[in-house]
A protein has these predicted regions:
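Short, solvent-exposed loop/turn segments at the edges of secondary structure
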Residues: 8, 19, 299, 351, ...
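Outer-membrane beta-barrel translocator/pore domains, especially the C-terminal barrels
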Residues: 115, 125-127, 148, 154, ...
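Outer-membrane beta-barrel transmembrane strands
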Residues: 236-240, 325, 347, 354-360, ...
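Classical Sec-dependent N-terminal signal peptides that target proteins to the secretory pathway
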Residues: 2-23
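Carboxylate/His-rich catalytic cores and anion/metal-binding grooves
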Residues: 184-209, 214-220, 318-320, 364, ...
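Structural signature for solvent-exposed beta-strand/loop edge elements and short helix-capping sites
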Residues: 22-354, 656-659, 675-682, 688-692, ...
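Catalytic micro-motifs at enzyme active sites that drive phosphoryl/nucleotidyl and oxygen chemistry
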Residues: 165-167, 344-346, 379-381, 450, ...
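A residue-level signal for conserved active-site and pocket-lining positions in enzyme catalytic cores
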Residues: 17, 250, 358, 393, ...
């Protein structure tokens, strides 16, 4: 082959020197099944610093207009791109390039192929027949019979085939009579389309819009489709960008057995502000009206989550306003209508928060003002107490080597009505369904502490003394409450022994805690927000109660140690053991003296083994020597390999919740890689105490680099209420026994994703949120 290199062509046309380029291998294939695109663009664009172009060809000639004709093995390099072809013609001003046969045009953001056409460099106008274009931003390839337009704005295609698959017959393709792309708005449309998957036509439409970039764009999102015990559930979401900092998603939704409604998600994010609003509204609910004819109202729910940093003009932060407020039309709406694009709450949530908090810091002070309330999602229970307002003032200062801390809380408690709960039952095991005139009033709590830390030989010693105070100002109740002041003291002694090993270290940390808190009679004081601290959190604490309605009486000591092995800056083994000895019987209780914690010798242990990032085992438990019973325990086992993932979890608590019920749950989760992108996913939760299924989920997923298909079936046992508004029961226990049974709620979700063309929200993430492996 006689290759002519025009190193002297600058005398005639100022083309400059030749730079070798290579058009082979510009598009490579991704072999990862979960990749976002099958094709990866590797542009080989010669970096030319001026406006000249460089050419190479077997044959060269000039016509009467001084245009350069090139034939055989043509290669043209120019600023921002390169072109290879069998034949090409370059105009005298080097602006127009015409080409024929086996042409490849490589640009920074596009790769084009074709049999005949032209390209104007100054305007990026292009015409091609029988070719293709690759859009690297989405990994899309468009074959066409004819293309014309400008690469800077509008492109028009005739007889187009769109796909992100190297072999569309094994994946997906969309055939269209006409396709338009706008490279300024990054939007496109297709007319008279046919969608084929694995060569089978599955969908036809006269018109379909789509995006040509991964950036945020307004427009319709992929519809969602599922089938449940409430019939077919179908929604069409629309996403709109309101500004650089905000967007909104609206979805029209229809549930066959319930009716039509709308969902909304609004987001606003800026440097000092984060706002999220989720809401849905159904004007009526056919199934609700059938089961409860007296209820004909609309059903809705919303949740507002907002945070605003309070900054002055100089940028100094004065504090923050935080809002977490949710409300629902009725207690059962989230159970009956789970969100599709919204996250107001989950089907098993017990309440919605209704909180507003303002807090600030000034030198040694932290101050907050708060409203805290709830809406119950259990129709048998009331909304409980509201804290409005609740004022917190925290002071901390170090004087010489002494740390001084003072916490002051003043809270007003209000309630229209109240149900009884643990610590406030009328008789053993019986809880009033309604207290029409509950105790209300203001509570003042103070905690003053002086502490000092010092090192004695190999021991770290933290010693503190303090005074806790509690007083009440109750409204219209002649309750013999006691204003109390209780001194307390804590000595915490610890040490650490290190041994350096190859690639890491091991350590042992022994610990001793001695605690004392003087007994004060609090039998007449109300219980607004307190409960027993969970068993495993009592060992190294000098308090048995959460909240501020009780000051615990304590005379105890706890001993324990923690052993740890660290390799490559990662903990591979942990083991902790602790035991608490109570030296005298506790006399402070909530409201029932029979519920005083009897455990005088309790111990807890926990361990974690994680030899590598793919395998882990975690175990914890709490045991009492006096009754020889396990009070709390849990196991997590997780392993990953090329075959898939397996997780096993177990949770046990002897007394949990307001009614002190035994919780005994287990779960198995698995994700099995079958072959060539196929995967089976399953999750099964079981209540071992009552031997009933809680929830099961199984799904089949196929994914390769251009398509993802998922079919997910879920099955839940949820509480069903025979009469939502029956108030004839005196005790919650009786209402629970007579009004509640179990209802099975099943659902099948269908998901698909045409990679590069569409995007699908993987609902598996939401379905796995309540996995025991997360707790």
């Amino acid at each position: 082959m006689n290759t002519i290199r025009f190193t002297a062509l600058s005398v005639l046309l100022s083309f400059g020197i030749f730079l070798e380029a290579n058009n082979s291998g510009l598009i490579s294939m991704s072999k990862n099944y979960s990749a976002d695109s099958c094709m990866v663009y590797n542009p080989d664009i010669t970096l030319i610093q001026n406006k000249d172009i460089n050419v190479e060809a077997d044959l060269l000639s000039f016509d009467e207009n001084n245009a350069v004709s090139l034939k055989n093995n043509v290669l043209i390099d120019f600023p921002g791109g390169s072109l290879s072809s069998s034949e090409a013609l370059i105009s005298e001003n080097k602006n127009l390039i015409q080409f024929e046969k086996d042409t490849k045009l490589s640009l920074e953001n596009f790769f084009l192929q074709g049999q005949k056409g032209s390209f104007i460099r100054s305007s990026n106008n292009i015409e091609i027949q029988d070719g293709s274009i690759f859009l690297p931003f989405r990994g899309l390839k468009v074959n066409f019979s004819q293309l014309n337009g400008s690469l800077d704005n509008d492109l028009n295609f005739k007889d187009a085939i769109i796909s992100s698959c190297m072999n569309p017959s094994d994946g997906w393709l969309i055939g269209a009579n006409e396709v338009g792309l706008n490279n300024e708005t990054y939007r496109g449309y297709a007319k008279n389309i046919t969608l084929k998957i694995k060569g089978i036509s599955v969908f036809k439409a006269p018109y379909m819009p789509f995006a040509t970039t991964n950036e945020r764009l307004s427009g319709f999102l992929e519809p969602t489709l599922s089938s449940s015990s409430d019939g077919v559930d179908f929604s069409v979401p629309y996403f709109a960008i309101l500004s650089d900092h905000s967007d909104i998603t609206l979805a029209l939704r229809n549930i066959a057995e319930r009716g039509s409604g709308i969902e909304l998600n609004y987001r606003y994010i800026k440097e000092h502000t984060k706002n999220n609003i989720d809401a849905f509204y159904f004007n009526s609910d056919k199934k609700m009206q059938k089961n409860f004819p007296e209820q004909t109202n609309s059903r809705w729910a919303y949740k507002i989550q907002d945070s605003l940093m309070l900054n002055n003009s100089s940028g100094m932060n004065w504090g923050e306003i935080v809002i977490n407020w949710g409300e629902a039309s009725d207690a059962m709406v989230l159970r009956d209508i789970p969100g599709e694009i919204t996250s107001v709450g989950m089907q098993r949530d017990h309440y919605l928060n209704q909180n507003v908090k303002i807090h600030s810091s000034f030198k040694n002070f932290q101050i907050s003002l708060e409203h805290q309330g709830y809406q119950t999602l259990n129709p048998l229970l009331t909304n409980g107490y509201k804290k409005s307002p609740s004022i917190n003032v925290n002071f901390s200062k170090r004087i010489n080597s002494v740390n001084i801390k003072h916490k002051l809380n003043i809270t007003n408690f209000e309630a229209n009505n109240l149900h009884e709960f643990f610590g406030a039952s009328s008789s053993m095991g019986k809880y009033l369904a309604i207290i029409e005139d509950p105790i209300e009033g203001r509570r003042t709590y103070s905690d003053l502490t002086f502490s000092k830390q010092f090192i004695k030989n190999i021991f770290n010693i933290d010693a503190s003394i303090g005074l806790k105070s509690l007083s009440y100002d109750l409204n219209s109740h002649k309750l013999a409450n006691n204003n109390i002041h209780s001194p307390n003291a804590i000595i915490n002694v610890s040490s650490i022994f290190l041994k350096n090993n190859k690639n890491g270290f091991s350590s042992i940390q022994p610990r001793l805690l001695i605690g004392f808190s003087q007994y004060k009679d609090q039998a007449g004081n109300p219980v607004f927000d307190s409960d027993l601290v969970s068993y495993n959190n009592q060992v190294f604490e000098n308090n048995r109660f959460s909240g501020m309605d009780r000051i615990s009486d304590e005379a105890n000591h706890s001993i324990g140690f923690a052993y740890k092995v660290n390799k490559y800056n990662r903990d591979v083994l942990k083991f902790t053991f602790a035991k608490k000895y109570t030296h005298s019987d506790n006399k402070v209780y909530l409201s029932n003296p029979n519920m005083v914690n009897p455990h005088k010798k309790k111990f807890i242990m926990s361990s974690m083994w994680m030899p590598n990032m793919n395998n882990s085992l975690k175990i914890y438990g709490g045991f009492d020597n006096k009754d020889d019973k396990l009070h709390i325990g849990g196991i997590n086992f997780l392993t990953k390999s090329s075959l898939g993932t397996l997780g096993v979890a177990k949770r046990y608590r002897r007394m949990a919740g307001n009614f002190r019920q035994t919780l005994n749950y287990s779960e198995i989760y698995t994700s099995i890689n079958i072959r060539d992108g196929f995967k089976i996913i399953g999750k099964f939760q079981h209540d071992n105490e009552y031997d009933v299924k809680i929830q099961s989920m199984i799904g089949l997923e196929y994914e390769n680099c251009c398509i993802a298909l998922r079919i997910i079936g879920s099955d839940k046992n949820l509480t069903r209420y025979n009469d939502l508004y029956n108030s004839s029961y005196t005790y919650i226990n009786d209402a629970w026994d007579n009004m509640i049974n179990i209802e099975n709620k099943s659902r099948i979700n269908f998901e698909f994703e045409l990679k590069g063309f569409s995007a699908s929200v993987n609902k598996l993430d939401r379905m796995l949120q309540d996995s025991l492996l997360n707790y």
